[in-house]
């Protein structure tokens, strides 16, 4: 089996997990990596003045790139995981080669769905994942005891990175719906993982969720940039609490036939993101994208 080394900047983080799902050998030495899985804003700032880096930067971000345009290096070997990231970087003159989606490695515990809702996420700097909203809204409907919160806010039942893969999928499969209410996602892996076991997302229909999820969408009512300080400015979307209440009520009163149809639909959609047995060859993916572009211009 081919060994591909992937640089990630952290250990208990989604980038580390992504590298494992893609079948890569993790390294924290950027000069030794063939692929760099990182937030592109942070990567292009961190290595702004270092020339001898040759990895393919495969990134996704929730930062507003416009706010960092004068701090970022030009980097040709750069792909993103979502189309909204692609458009954002293209607008500031740092055009990625293409979009290459992330992948999942689902497990399928044989358990009944004995919970209503689940959410999973780690909010940093501010509650970007809307974990507190999940806690509050499920209490409002008196279903907090039928809700699983995995995270670091919102009175979580489990810490984000404390679970094994089997434990995580055991929680996914127990829930009927995934509350994907994050204000911004560069890609949005957890609800796709949940879809693989038939758990239906109730999701904010924006950012990475809009292009990757299916289920019960809630359209955004506002879009803006939130700066928590001079160094951290995020592109965020807001949802209507009224529409959220409507969809939760819809979920609570949904017929068995409607739910089973939706569950089958989301499970089928998730198969688009399944990882292969071999380490993911991002160079092959880039070659295929180039051929598709060439055919489109003929």
Q: What are these model-predicted stretches?
A:
Residues 1-47, 241, 276-286:
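N-terminal pre-catalytic "stem/leader" segment of glycosyltransferase-like enzymes
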Residues 76-88, 93-108:
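Donor nucleotide-sugar binding/catalytic pocket of nucleotide-sugar-dependent glycosyltransferases
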Residues 106, 113-158, 163-165:
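Conserved catalytic-core segment of nucleotide-activated headgroup transferases in glycan assembly
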Residues 170-175:
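Short alpha-helical donor nucleotide-sugar binding micro-motif in glycosyltransferases
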Residues 183:
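Aromatic "clamp/platform" in nucleotide-sugar-dependent glycosyltransferases that forms part
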Residues 200-203, 210:
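Short hydrophobic beta-strand element within catalytic cores of glycosyltransferases
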Residues 235-246, 253-288:
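A charged, aromatic-enriched C-terminal amphipathic alpha-helix characteristic of glycosyltransferases
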């Amino acid at each position: 089996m081919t060994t591909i080394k992937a640089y990630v900047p952290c250990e208990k983080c989604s980038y580390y997990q992504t590298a494992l799902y893609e079948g890569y050998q993790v390294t924290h030495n950027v000069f030794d990596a063939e692929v760099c899985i990182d937030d592109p804003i942070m990567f292009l700032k961190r290595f702004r003045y270092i020339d001898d880096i040759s990895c393919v930067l495969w990134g996704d971000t929730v930062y507003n790139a416009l706010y960092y345009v004068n701090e970022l290096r030009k980097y040709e070997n750069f792909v993103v995981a979502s189309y909204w990231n692609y458009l954002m970087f293209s607008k500031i003159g740092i055009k990625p080669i293409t979009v290459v989606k992330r992948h999942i490695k689902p497990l399928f515990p044989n358990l009944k769905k004995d919970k209503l809702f689940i959410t999973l996420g780690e909010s940093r700097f501010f509650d970007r994942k809307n974990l507190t909203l999940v806690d509050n809204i499920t209490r409002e409907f008196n279903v907090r005891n039928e809700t699983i919160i995995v995270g670091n806010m919102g009175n979580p039942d489990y810490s984000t990175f404390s679970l094994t893969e089997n434990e995580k999928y055991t929680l996914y499969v127990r829930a009927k719906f995934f509350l994907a209410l994050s204000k911004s996602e560069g890609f949005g892996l957890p609800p796709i993982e949940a879809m693989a076991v038939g758990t239906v997302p109730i999701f904010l229909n924006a950012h990475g969720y809009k292009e990757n999820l299916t289920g019960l969408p809630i359209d955004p009512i506002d879009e803006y940039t939130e700066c928590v300080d001079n160094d951290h400015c995020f592109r965020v979307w807001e949802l209507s609490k009224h529409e959220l209440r409507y969809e939760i009520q819809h979920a609570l009163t949904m017929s068995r036939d409607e739910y089973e149809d939706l569950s089958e639909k989301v499970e089928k959609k998730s198969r688009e993101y399944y990882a292969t047995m071999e380490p993911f060859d991002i160079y092959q993916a880039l070659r295929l994208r180039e051929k598709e572009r060439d055919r489109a211009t003929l």
